[in-house]
């Protein structure tokens, strides 16, 4: 919205919050797996490009309920791509994950490193990437897939931030301790190749990630 784009948001609000929706954006409550919903949205609005965030994303949950991840993530991508082809929309930016790589062979991970997901979440995202590749070859859709880990942070004025119930993300859990909402934080692992044996993690700030998606939209617009 701040870049001057006309934004249309589609969310079933299972984990989303209307309070985070910019009032200048047009909002539809709907599910990506509902073809009739996508057809109505694509008919009522002049859509130039799609930015796809609609996925389940908890690694642990994906191990106990992989069906949920293949249904929402993979089937959702199928319904979306079919709707895009029907309506002549040929650009998509996809929120993927570094979990597509599995256990990295080297640090930092390079884009062309081998992809060997170790959980259904990462596997579902890799399948979604491959779906875009083949639809691109068959129907001319241009796509960008962004693989990242550990998005964190909040907007600078604090009006929008992480909001999960129950909370599962590390940084919000840590902040609950000084706020008196949690007695302590537990750090798991003691055999990593680090000075104290605990795990190292890297993070990307959500505002940087938002900028990356805006830049990624321009890539297929320029013919990439």
Spans of model-derived segments:
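A short acidic, helix-capping loop that chelates divalent metal ions and anchors anionic groups
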Residues: 59-63, 154-160, 195-197
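N-terminal Rossmann-like NAD(P)+-binding domain of SDR-like oxidoreductases, especially those catalyzing
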Residues: 1-151
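The catalytic Tyr-centered alpha-helix of NAD(P)H-dependent dehydrogenases
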Residues: 106, 117-124, 163-171, 202-206
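Pocket-edge positions in alpha/beta enzyme catalytic cores
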Residues: 30, 42, 69, 162-166, ...
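Short, cationic motifs built from Arg/Lys/His that form the positively charged side of catalytic pockets
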Residues: 125, 147, 195-201
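Alpha-helical substrate-binding/gating segment
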Residues: 151-154, 172-194, 201-224
């Amino acid at each position: 919205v701040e870049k001057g784009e006309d934004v249309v948001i589609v969310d079933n609000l299972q984990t989303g919050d209307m309070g985070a929706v910019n009032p200048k954006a047009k909002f539809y409550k709907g599910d990506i797996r509902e073809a009739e919903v996508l057809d109505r949205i694509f008919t009522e609005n002049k859509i130039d490009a799609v930015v796809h965030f609609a996925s389940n994303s908890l690694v642990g949950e994906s191990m106990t309920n992989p069906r949920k991840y293949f249904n929402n993530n993979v089937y959702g991508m199928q319904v979306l791509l079919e709707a895009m082809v029907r309506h002549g929309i040929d650009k998509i930016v996809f929120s993927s994950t570094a979990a597509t790589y599995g256990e990295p062979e080297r640090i930092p991970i390079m884009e062309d490193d081998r992809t060997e997901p170790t959980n259904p979440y990462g596997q579902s995202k890799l399948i979604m990437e491959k779906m875009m590749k083949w639809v691109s070859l068959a129907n001319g859709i241009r796509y960008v897939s962004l693989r990242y880990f550990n998005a964190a942070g909040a907007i600078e004025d604090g009006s929008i931030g992480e909001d999960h119930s129950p909370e599962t993300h590390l940084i919000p859990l840590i902040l609950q301790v000084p706020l008196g909402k949690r007695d302590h934080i537990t750090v798991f692992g003691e055999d990593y190749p680090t000075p104290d044996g605990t795990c190292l993690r890297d993070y990307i700030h959500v505002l940087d990630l938002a900028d990356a998606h805006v830049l990624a939209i321009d890539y297929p617009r320029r013919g990439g």
